[in-house]
Swiss-Prot record:
Belongs to the radical SAM superfamily. Lipoyl synthase family. [4Fe-4S] cluster 2 binds at residues 141, 145, 148. Pathway: Protein modification; protein lipoylation via endogenous pathway; protein N(6)-(lipoyl)lysine from octanoyl-[acyl-carrier-protein]: step 2/2. It comes from Zea mays (Maize). The lineage of its organism: Eukaryota, Viridiplantae, Streptophyta, Embryophyta, Tracheophyta. The gene is LIP1. This is Lipoyl synthase, mitochondrial. Its cofactor is [4Fe-4S] cluster. It catalyses: [[Fe-S] cluster scaffold protein carrying a second [4Fe-4S](2+) cluster] + N(6)-octanoyl-L-lysyl-[protein] + 2 oxidized [2Fe-2S]-[ferredoxin] + 2 S-adenosyl-L-methionine + 4 H(+) = [[Fe-S] cluster scaffold protein] + N(6)-[(R)-dihydrolipoyl]-L-lysyl-[protein] + 4 Fe(3+) + 2 hydrogen sulfide + 2 5'-deoxyadenosine + 2 L-methionine + 2 reduced [2Fe-2S]-[ferredoxin].
Length: 383
């Protein structure tokens, strides 16, 4: 534990461009005092007049006020450091995938969340293997997390009953070996959309039995029956993101989400899913967390027997969303990766541009799944 405290201290030194966390000034109720109210004693009248003058001079505009309520600060956005430069999307594979998605009326979290890796993943990047994360259950979420760019509504359109078949058709036409399926939250549906999710996985498995499937799911409000339905649908990786450290959950996520509920979902998935199924979660950095908080959160996630964890830099989608608190250095990301391996996570992806569905980790996860399959085959043979 002493070593981890030392690591936390070194991580703090590795972080750069962290703005001060001062709270913006707000106008005082003294400005609205009724003139008929008797004045204070003469001795304090001068100080009160000066206070009123200073408050009025420093009073924020309406825009400043709404901004401070929205994000808790009046500071200007931080400039992006050199390591956060993005690649412009392009290439033949990128165009082909985009055209196919439009044709089949499918949505990807890559586009909806404005993922910085969209161009690399869709075009194939260094490996030449194009990857996309399909988003099912529509493109409108019933929740409003402060970091997310997906549009929201209390009453989104009903799910498309043909979507599971369309997803299977799209994936088959791409010839992929590993696919990630995710979804918006659907608190408006009786089963939170878990049945639709499970059906999509099952149709994919029927069409391509050898395909490796990762499902990045919402919390289903912690409903065990919903978690079980998806965990037993035939997937290989059950992923659910805790998004941020325990202490910042209410600041970052929708009020219906919380740390304990997410940990419970990951634990239930491990219990319900067949042996060899991996569980996975992701944490954004740069939301105002401290290294100590990150380490404590990692310990609790590992205690839930989660196999894979990823770390990436939070990037503000628009001015309507919470601001970036700090840009975490690549060196700090590497220290979190090393610590995760030391803690016993089977795989850790950690870097400024890493996202929970980023393809760089899928090759390692694929190898882990195939190793589990080999174990199962060997066990069956010996029996």
């Amino acid at each position: 534990m002493h070593g981890r405290r030392h690591l936390a201290a070194s991580l703090t030194r590795a972080l750069i461009q962290a703005p001060s966390r001062s709270i913006s000034s707000t106008p005082s109720l003294l400005q609205t005092l009724d003139p008929s109210v008797p004045s204070p004693p003469a001795a304090g009248a001068g100080r009160l007049a000066e206070l009123r003058r200073r408050l009025q001079a420093d009073a924020p505009s309406l825009g400043d006020f709404t901004y401070s309520v929205e994000v808790g600060t009046r500071q200007r956005p931080l400039p992006k450091p050199k390591w956060m430069k993005e690649t412009v999307p392009g290439g033949a594979k990128y165009a082909a995938i985009k055209a196919k998605l439009r044709e089949l009326k499918l949505h990807t979290v890559c586009e909806e969340a404005r993922c910085p890796n969209l161009g690399e993943c869709w075009s194939g990047g260094e490996t030449g293997t194009a990857t996309a994360t399909i988003m099912i259950l529509g493109d409108t979420c019933t929740r409003g997390c402060r970091f997310c760019n997906v549009k929201t509504s209390r009453t989104p359109p009903p799910p498309d009953p043909d979507e599971p078949s369309n997803v299977a058709q799209a994936i088959a036409s791409w010839g992929l070996e590993y696919i990630v399926i995710t979804s918006v939250d659907r608190d408006d549906l009786p089963d939170q959309g878990s049945g639709h999710f499970a059906e999509t996985v099952q149709k994919l498995k029927a069409l391509k039995p050898e395909m490796l499937i990762e499902a990045l799911v919402p919390d289903f409000r912690g409903d065990p029956s919903c978690v079980e339905k998806v965990a037993t649908s035939g997937l290989h990786v059950f992923a659910h993101n805790i998004e941020t450290v325990e202490e910042l959950q209410r600041n970052v996520r929708d009020y219906r989400a919380n740390f304990k509920q997410s940990i419970d979902v990951l634990e239930m998935a491990k219990e319900y899913a067949p042996p060899g199924t991996l569980t996975k979660t992701s944490i954004m950095l740069g939301c105002g967390e401290t290294p100590d908080q990150v380490i404590r959160t990692m310990e609790k996630v590992r205690a839930a027997d989660v196999d894979v964890i990823t770390f990436g830099q939070y990037m503000r989608p628009s001015k309507r969303h919470m601001p970036v608190s700090e840009y975490v250095t690549p060196e700090a990301f590497e220290k979190y990766r090393a610590l995760g391996v030391e803690m016993g996570f089977r795989y850790v992806a950690s870097g400024p541009m890493v996202r929970s569905s980023y393809k760089a980790g899928e090759f390692y996860i694929k190898a882990m799944i195939e190793a589990e399959r080999a174990k199962g085959t060997a066990a069956d043979s010996s029996a």
